């Protein structure tokens, strides 16, 4: 068994720490707040984020050096906005042989960097050795040992397999991939569509509208991802359509809940205050909107959600705008993607 540090004691970090502890690993869970770490150690629960029993194999820390000293792997599970600061501090203490895995789904708005790119910039690590863990995985269900499947991805497949070995269990099945670009983009961009699904439900629309959002949202994700060099087939996998389905249809989803409040007429600032947790899709929509412009990629749903969030456009007007777009063939997207990928 191995020593693993999990950086980020929110709901997702706690759930992943539980998976690792169940597999017999020695787990160190890092929180940026000393009192939070102390409470976890005293009560063996994380009342603020994920109120379930925490195994004795998990010890919480607030000191980065203590957390990562001598570990075999580090799992980074902090919000996108904290990635650079946390990785800069991590880089001071981490051994060069340690496997670095991240499980954060987002894109930096200004730089348009994916999380793996941010990690590379802040740490002394080769980009090809960074691993991402992604897929349809609500923390609440993972912590309860409900069956869950995810993907670990890295250009260096040996690193991806190391992560696969660390996490695989009877209730947590892990696949591998070498398309880190596609896996990261699928995990990040689906949050935008989940906001849209929540808005749709908040407006009182039914299953037809949600199915349309998921399907056409997937087309947008694949268009942008392929334009950036991702394998289009990755978007048909766990981190693509899998994560899209679970995030768009579950009340566990922060992005769906935020969208639902927006659809009911609440303002963005009030929604974020009411949520009290990071809603990655709000930041990601800015990045995707800019990506679409830069890559000249058609992303009408993303554009509509951007208008609702940042241009104060009425959600019903955006729906009308989407429904009255120019007529087209549904298979145009698939034909273009496959031609770009497989033509000589």
From Swiss-Prot:
> Which enzyme type, at the first EC level?
oxidoreductase
Q: What is the protein's known function? A: Catalyzes the reduction of the glycolytic intermediate dihydroxyacetone phosphate (DHAP) to sn-glycerol 3-phosphate (G3P), the key precursor for phospholipid synthesis.
By what name is this protein known?
Answer: Glycerol-3-phosphate dehydrogenase [NAD(P)+]
- Binding of sn-glycerol 3-phosphate, residues: 105, 135, 137, 190, 243, 253-255
Keyword hit for Lipid biosynthesis = yes
List its EC numbers.
1.1.1.94
Q: Offer a single GO CC term for the protein.
A: cytosol
Q: Where in the cell is it found?
A: Cytoplasm
Q: In which pathway does it act?
A: Membrane lipid metabolism; glycerophospholipid metabolism
UniProt catalytic activity: sn-glycerol 3-phosphate + NAD(+) = dihydroxyacetone phosphate + NADH + H(+); sn-glycerol 3-phosphate + NADP(+) = dihydroxyacetone phosphate + NADPH + H(+)
**What are the record keywords, sorted?**
Cytoplasm, Lipid biosynthesis, Lipid metabolism, NAD, NADP, Nucleotide-binding, Oxidoreductase, Phospholipid biosynthesis, Phospholipid metabolism
Record's keyword annotation contains NADP: yes
| Gene Ontology biological-process entries | carbohydrate metabolic process; glycerol-3-phosphate biosynthetic process; glycerol-3-phosphate catabolic process; glycerophospholipid metabolic process; phospholipid biosynthetic process
Binding sites annotated in the UniProt record for NADPH: 11-12, 32-33, 105, 139, 254, 278, 280
Q: What is the lineage of its organism?
A: Bacteria, Bacillati, Bacillota, Bacilli, Bacillales
- Principal location listed in the UniProt entry: cytoplasm
Query: According to its UniProt record, which residues of this chain constitute the active site?
Result: 190
Family as reported in the entry's similarity comment:
Belongs to the NAD-dependent glycerol-3-phosphate dehydrogenase family.
Entry GO MF terms: glycerol-3-phosphate dehydrogenase [NAD(P)+] activity; NAD binding
């Amino acid at each position: 068994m191995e020593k693993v540090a999990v950086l980020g004691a929110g709901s997702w970090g706690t759930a992943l720490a539980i998976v690792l502890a169940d597999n017999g690993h020695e787990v160190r869970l890092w929180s940026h707040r000393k009192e939070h770490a102390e409470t976890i150690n005293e009560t063996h629960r994380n009342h603020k984020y994920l109120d379930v029993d925490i195994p004795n194999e998990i010890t919480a820390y607030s000191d980065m050096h203590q957390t990562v000293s001598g570990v075999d792997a580090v799992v980074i599970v902090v919000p996108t906005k904290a990635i650079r600061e946390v990785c800069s501090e991590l880089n001071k203490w981490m051994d060069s042989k340690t496997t670095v895995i991240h499980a954060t789904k987002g894109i930096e708005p200004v730089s348009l960097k994916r999380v793996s790119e941010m990690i590379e910039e802040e740490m002394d690590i080769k980009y090809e050795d960074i691993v991402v863990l992604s897929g349809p995985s609500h923390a609440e269900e993972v912590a309860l040992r409900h069956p869950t499947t995810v993907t670990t991805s890295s250009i260096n497949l040996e690193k991806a397999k190391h992560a696969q070995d660390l996490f695989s269990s009877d209730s947590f099945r892990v696949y591998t991939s070498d398309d880190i670009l596609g896996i990261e983009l699928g995990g990040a961009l689906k949050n935008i569509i989940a906001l849209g699904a929540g808005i749709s439900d908040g407006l009182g629309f039914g299953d037809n509208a949600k199915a349309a959002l998921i399907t056409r949202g997937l087309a947008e994700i694949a268009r942008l991802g392929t334009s950036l060099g991702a394998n289009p087939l990755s978007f048909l996998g766990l981190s693509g359509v899998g994560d899209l389905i679970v995030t768009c249809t579950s009340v566990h989803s922060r992005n769906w809940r935020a969208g639902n409040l927006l659809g009911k007429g609440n303002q963005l600032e009030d929604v974020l205050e009411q949520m009290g947790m990071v809603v990655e899709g709000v930041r990601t929509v800015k990045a995707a909107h800019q990506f679409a412009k830069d890559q000249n990629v058609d992303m009408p749903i993303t554009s509509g959600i951007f208008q609702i969030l940042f241009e104060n456009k009425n959600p019903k007007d955006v729906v009308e705008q989407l429904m009255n777009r120019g007529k087209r063939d549904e298979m145009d997207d698939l034909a273009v993607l496959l031609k770009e990928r497989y033509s000589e």
